[in-house]
Amino acid sequence: MNDLSTATPEQPPIVEVQDMRVTFGSQNVLRGVALSVPRGQSLAIIGESGCGKTVLLKTVIGLVRPTSGVVRFCGYNLAELSDRELTRQRVRFGYVFQNAALFDSLTVGQNVAFPLRQHKSESPSRIRELVLARLAEVGLPNSVISKKPAELSGGMRKRVALARALIMNPELMLYDEPTTGLDPIMSDVINELMLRTRNQHDVTSIIVTHDMRTAHKVADRVVMIYPVNRLEPDEPQLIFDGTPDELKACGDRRVLQFVRGEAGERLAEMHQASSDREPQS
């Protein structure tokens, strides 16, 4: 397996995570996570539901603060930034939430323009121009600008969310399950838009996904997170780090079962856990 986690001097990491741990109460979600993402890379984070993928994504933008360890963006230790400084850095991110997270009471145009109005001083005509340009970029006609999110299909809402994420010309794009709930064709449309976004805007991308088609098509690097509660005490939580082709050839049975969608041992574990809870006669 190639070591893709070490950035070269010519390509310093845009994101760097060092020995990070995240706990919520007594629940250990992330443990000893180390990750370095060079500029321009497209990284897919895969793993079972509840293993900590989205939590990791949120630590990258400072929405979740690690219990211990360090998260850096462009060299800044996010834990050391004030709220004002952190807000200033977040302008450099674009985030596409799993459910699109559009404001239901706002029109499409107002949703896409929201970051501009919060962080820039642009004229109404310039804002409209930028909004229409971003909508066109994701394949939406001008006519949607006055519609409310409830009037749109799931795929259209995802594209509006992408347009909003791009409106501030981010350096780093983060996608949380971007194809969840979409049919195969619309999922591929979103995959193509993510590829186009990376190529046209020269952005770094981090994609949390269960969709192996997305991981293979969009990413040039894949890491897999394994649930902490199913690891040995000293075992690393990132059980795979390599290219999509290396993922297909990986010999780790846990990785193969996930990639192939095979319940196998997981089903047996669930059955055993259920049996252990049954009252003794």
Feature map (PLM): residue ranges:
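Helix-to-loop junction immediately C-terminal to a conserved catalytic motif
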Residues: 61
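Conserved ABC transporter NBD signature motif
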Residues: 69-77
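Conserved ABC ATPase "signature" region
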Residues: 76-77, 124-143
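Short coil-to-helix segment of the ABC ATPase nucleotide-binding domain corresponding to the Q-loop/switch region
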Residues: 105-114
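Conserved catalytic motifs of ABC-family nucleotide-binding domains
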Residues: 169
